[in-house]
Amino acid sequence: SGSGKSTLLNMLGCLDRPSSGKLYLGDDDVAQMNDDQLSYIRASRIGIVFQAYNLIQQLTVVENIEVPLIYQGRISKSDKQRCVELAKMVGLGQRLDHRPTQLSGGQQQRVAIARSLVNNPYFILADEPTGNLDSKTTYEILALFQQLNDAGKTIILVTHEDDVSRHAKRVIRLRDGLIQVDQRHEQERFDEVPMAVALAAVSAL
């Protein structure tokens, strides 16, 4: 608490603007954008995964994955197929028509991860994504993030847990709003099937 995590998350997620300086996402200085422009950036370039999943209870797995597309006013036949393929990619191929109340916590977080990928974002911002999960399910979700990273997707994951951070390639520690540690190290690996080919196929839809 008080480390500056929330401020950093809000900056990276384009929810807040810096009081001075510049903040670039690609070639764009988002610090100079208006609210409508920032809303578009959030919807099209940033995937967000929350600790509490934030799924819509009345919608199915596939319909929840479709939500960012609906907010953008587009949902074509190919978009719908992409959502189905994303659900399958995260291991929910047998639960496409299930609603959140019919899913475990880990399964709900898999829906949230698939939803974060639907617009093929520049990066995924994950805020304590394993905070509500047991240890076994935590490792399953971390393995999924690791596979996505292996497939070329940047993951920015916030955690208080050393057991979680040791699975990252790079660890940045904050204290009182300042970076105390910024180090790269050999990450602990999971014995999972790589999904690079699957993610590439979904992105091509």
State the predicted function of each range.
Residues 1-167, 174:
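ABC family nucleotide-binding domain
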Residues 115, 127, 199-205:
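Generic hydrophobic, helix-prone segments enriched in Leu/Val/Ile
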